[in-house]
Amino acid sequence: MRCLENHDQPRICSFIKDPLALENFTAFLYFLKGTTLLYAGQEFCCTEIPSLFEKDVFHRTLGDISSWFVKLNQLKKTVLSCEDAFVGKADDKHDIAILERNDTKVRKLGIFSLKGKKADVKVEFLDGTYTNHLDGSSITVKNGMLSCNGKPIVLTFSVE
């Protein structure tokens, strides 16, 4: 199981304040292999750890990112495969995670700017223009580089 928060660690929104960084961390979580665990109230950007033994009402005034969870869950079910091989790399200079999943038919590339910042990123992906599965935008890979605008990117291409 993979999670950003649970009952014995601080809430992700208690230390990731930038919404774009949170969007990237959440997309990163879903791109990882394994079951994604969401902790109660995470969809409302809660910052306080709820009690395990007392009734606790979630404050819904901080935000509602449940629609983002729905989109990422759909990606996990339709684009990613439990049969994928997985490789993770990092661009430490720009705080960007570069993840690749690959089965025998489709390569999947995930670019996650963990600070929500723009940067040019070196990738091992064929030159061309691809559709970002997360927002429908066009992403161009040229000479093994792509431009990340700070938002998470998931690209695919067939290897058959």
Model feature map: region roles:
Residues 1-36, 40, 44, 91-93:
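Alpha-amylase-like alpha-glycosidases and glucanotransferases acting on alpha-linked glucans and related
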Residues 3, 25, 68-72, 153:
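Alpha-helical packing segments of well-folded alpha/beta enzyme cores
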Residues 9, 31, 52, 59, ...:
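Substrate-binding and catalytic surfaces of secreted/luminal carbohydrate-active proteins
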Residues 46-94:
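Aromatic- and carboxylate-lined catalytic core of secreted/periplasmic carbohydrate-active enzymes
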Residues 89-124:
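Carbohydrate-binding surface patches
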Residues 124-136:
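Solvent-exposed beta-hairpin/edge-strand motifs
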Residues 140-160:
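C-terminal beta-strand-rich structural cap/linker in extracellular carbohydrate-active enzymes
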